[in-house]
């Protein structure tokens, strides 16, 4: 429904657009006549909506007609194959490179010292039951026998018992202390390399991932490295060594029967543990997926807090978050239940073996083949074996879980870096303006939807060039391609006559400055956000660019000045202040190519004009190549060159007056609509004054 007011200007504009077929399929809009002064924002915004709809209809008319007349093609949905998993041995092999790094003798010496302390601790630990046996046997004699050993000898045996036990603990703790630096360095190196690899991946990869799940996976992966190293160095290797020594002692001291029971127990215990843990693994994977999903929902909701409040969707997101938590709860219940089954089975196997060995030992004592000290030795050795056996089960479970967590982390490192340097990259010439040329460039974010279609144009060096067109015509895509966030599917992009793929990526991006529509800010101080433009800038340079960007008045009003925290994504400051901060940041970078990606589209007219004056004062023509991506044509009317995009192709090129004089010009149609809206706004101002 569209109610026309008595205002002749409004009626004339709207009726003319209906007659020309420029406005259709519009959303219901209501213009009110009474209380015009209080309804001006509603009226003007409604008019802007009409213009946006008209603009879309003009620029997409041909493509819609072509689509409606084109034969329909059936699309086939490809089944996604299951992502290959990294083998556990491959993960351990990759991790070993950080424990035994090439050329780092200091780390290797630490590993060897830790290994020596480990062996010493276990040898002393095995000696403890022997000293205990000797003490028991020396007490089980007739004290009136003149051949009885002196009490001092017994005391020495007890002293050796204590020294062996304390020495075992001491060497074990020293091993932990020596190896701690090796483990932490490995964790730091893997985490840093993973972070650096992720920063090399293309923008498309990052946009297709949920940040919450990604950060949670990295956090679990780094913790998994610590757990794997702890399991391997502090448990698996010591346990294996101790079990081998104990089995050898039992075989040598008490015969093949004890050895057979020990071997059978170890074999059955290991098989049961491995099989059951493998069965439990998919429960842990399901729990991790649910945990990632819950973290992503929570993070997205908190980041988009304002949007949640705008649409009153707290309950919807709470239900969504609760659903993820319910899935995580169900998976964790299965993990706990399967853990109880595993623990019960392990204890049953060990208790059965211990009972059998104690029965055989008691039979030997009754038959006179073994002493009471031997029985105590068997009991101590078996119980001493039970400790590493119990650890073996729990450690193996933790090891499997950690390997699952590490699998995701290491798979992140396997993602291919698509945007790479040439074998011998070139450096860009310094202190000269750059021209940019697109030669038959075709690109799309999805294979079935091309954004740029065989686009060719030139942005002359030192000129102020504007790129205009409807939403989705490819304006911002041009920036992403020049910056090499993506590479074109076909065609070439040249800077000063050379393909940008020949240039060093860091050098290329160093000469390009960007003032985006939505300024990305860190949850840090104003000072740090400005200095992010060039980390090595001096304090004087930062203050200078802040003054040039007219950000100084704001900073003087703030109680904490430069130390004011801007909040998450800069939510604590206004849109105009964010844009001024972005300009200050780019001024500090001092780039030779400047992109303004609809930098003022979200601002009011007063703030927009102030920012445009700031931009004109600091980015004069001739000194830099500047590219303005804009919807509001008045902001770029003074451009040296205007490129009009339509459905991914270059529709028109020229200066403002040339394009207005061109018959059937799309630019002229868009300009006329905007001028009518501006005239409408002026009429409304006049009526308000009356």
From Swiss-Prot:
It comes from the Eukaryota. One of its GO terms (cellular component) is mitochondrion. GO terms for biological process: intracellular iron ion homeostasis; iron-sulfur cluster assembly; iron-sulfur cluster export from the mitochondrion; iron-sulfur cluster transmembrane transport; mitochondrial transmembrane transport; transmembrane transport. It is a multi-pass membrane protein. Residues 1-26 form a transit peptide. Changing residue 475 to M: Loss of function; significant decrease in ATP-binding; no homodimerization. It is found in: Mitochondrion inner membrane. Gene3D superfamilies: ABC transporter type 1, transmembrane domain, P-loop containing nucleotide triphosphate hydrolases. Glutathione binds at residues 280-284, 343-346, 393. It is an enzyme of class 7 (translocase). ATP binds at residues 445, 469-480. Residues 436-672 form the ABC transporter domain. The chain crosses the membrane at residues 111-132, 156-179, 229-252, 254-274, 341-359, 375-396. InterPro entries: AAA+_ATPase, ABC1_TM_dom, ABC1_TM_sf, ABC_transporter-like_ATP-bd, ABC_transporter-like_CS, P-loop_NTPase, Type_1_exporter. One of its GO terms (molecular function) is ATP binding. Performs an essential function in the generation of cytoplasmic iron-sulfur proteins by mediating the ATP-dependent export of Fe/S cluster precursors synthesized by NFS1 and other mitochondrial proteins. Hydrolyzes ATP. Binds glutathione and may function by transporting a glutathione-conjugated iron-sulfur compound. Present with 3250 molecules/cell in log phase SD medium. Belongs to the ABC transporter superfamily. ABCB family. Heavy Metal importer (TC 3.A.1.210) subfamily. This is Iron-sulfur clusters transporter ATM1, mitochondrial. The lineage of its organism: Eukaryota, Fungi, Dikarya, Ascomycota, Saccharomycotina.
């Amino acid at each position: 429904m569209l109610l026309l007011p008595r205002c002749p200007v409004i009626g004339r504009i709207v009726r003319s657009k209906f007659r020309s077929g420029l406005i259709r399929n519009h959303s219901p809009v209501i213009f009110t006549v009474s209380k015009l002064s209080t309804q001006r924002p509603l009226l003007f915004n409604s008019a802007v909506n009409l213009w946006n709809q008209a603009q879309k209809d003009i620029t997409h008319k041909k493509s819609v007609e072509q689509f409606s007349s084109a034969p329909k093609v059936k699309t086939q949905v490809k089944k996604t194959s299951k992502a290959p998993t990294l083998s556990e041995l491959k993960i351990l092999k990759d991790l070993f490179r950080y424990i035994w790094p090439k050329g780092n003798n200091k780390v290797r010496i630490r590993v060897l010292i830790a290994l020596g302390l480990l062996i010493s601790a276990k040898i002393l630990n095995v000696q403890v039951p022997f000293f205990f046996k000797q003490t028991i046997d020396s007490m089980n004699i007739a004290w009136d026998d003149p051949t009885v050993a002196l009490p001092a000898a017994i005391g020495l045996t007890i002293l050796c018992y204590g020294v062996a036990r304390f020495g075992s603990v001491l060497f074990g703790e020293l091993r932990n202390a020596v190896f701690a630096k090796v483990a932490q360095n490995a964790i730091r190196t893997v985490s840093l390399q993973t972070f650096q690899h992720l920063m090399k991946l293309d923008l498309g990869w990052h946009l297709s991932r949920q940040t919450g799940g990604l950060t949670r996976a990295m956090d679990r992966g780094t913790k998994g490295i610590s757990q794997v190293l702890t399991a391997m160095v502090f448990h698996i290797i010591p346990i294996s060594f101790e079990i081998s020594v104990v089995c050898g002692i039992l075989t040598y001291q008490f015969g093949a029967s004890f050895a057979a029971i020990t071997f059978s127990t170890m074999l059955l215990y290991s098989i049961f543990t491995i099989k059951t843990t493998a069965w439990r693994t998919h429960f842990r994977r399901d729990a991790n997926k649910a945990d990632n999903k819950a973290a992503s929902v929570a993070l997205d909701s908190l980041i988009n807090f304002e949007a949640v409040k705008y649409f009153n969707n707290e309950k919807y997101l709470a239900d969504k978050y609760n659903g993820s938590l319910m899935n995580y709860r169900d998976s964790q219940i299965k993990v706990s239940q399967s853990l109880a089954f595993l623990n019960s089975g392990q204890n049953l196997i060990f208790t059965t073996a211990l009972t059998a060995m104690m029965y055989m030992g008691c039979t030997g004592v009754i038959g006179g083949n073994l002493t009471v000290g031997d029985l105590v030795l068997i009991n101590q050795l078996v119980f001493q074996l039970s400790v590493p056996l119990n650890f073996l089960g729990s450690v193996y479970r933790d090891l499997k879980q950690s390997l699952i967590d590490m699998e995701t982390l290491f798979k992140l490192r396997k993602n291919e870096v698509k945007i790479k340097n040439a074998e011998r990259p070139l450096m860009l010439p310094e202190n000269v303006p750059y021209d940019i040329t697109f030669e038959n460039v075709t690109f799309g974010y999805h294979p079935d939807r091309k954004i740029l279609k065989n686009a060719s144009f030139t942005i002359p060096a030192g000129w102020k060039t504007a790129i205009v067109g409807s939403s989705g015509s490819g304006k911002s895509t041009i920036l992403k391609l020049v910056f090499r966030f993506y590479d074109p599917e076909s065609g070439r992009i040249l800077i000063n006559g050379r393909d940008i793929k020949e240039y060093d990526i860091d050098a290329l991006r160093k000469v390009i400055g960007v003032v985006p529509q939505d300024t990305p800010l860190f949850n840090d101080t104003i000072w740090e956000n400005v200095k992010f433009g060039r980390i090595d800038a001096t304090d004087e340079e930062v203050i200078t660019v802040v003054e040039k960007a007219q950000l100084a008045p704001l900073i003087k009003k703030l109680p904490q000045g430069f130390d004011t925290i801007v909040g998450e994504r800069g939510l604590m400051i206004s849109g105009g202040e964010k844009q001024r901060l972005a300009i200050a940041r780019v001024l500090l970078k001092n780039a030779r190519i400047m992109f303004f990606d609809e930098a003022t589209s979200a601002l009011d007219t007063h703030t927009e004009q102030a920012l445009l004056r700031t931009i004109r004062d600091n980015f004069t023509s001739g000194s830099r190549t500047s590219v303005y991506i804009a919807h509001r044509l008045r902001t770029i009317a003074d451009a040296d060159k205007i490129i009009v995009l339509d459905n991914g192709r270059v529709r028109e090129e020229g200066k403002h007056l040339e394009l207005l004089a061109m018959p059937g010009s799309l630019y002229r149609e868009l300009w006329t609509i905007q001028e009518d809206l501006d005239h409408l706004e002026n009429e409304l101002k006049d009526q308000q004054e009356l």
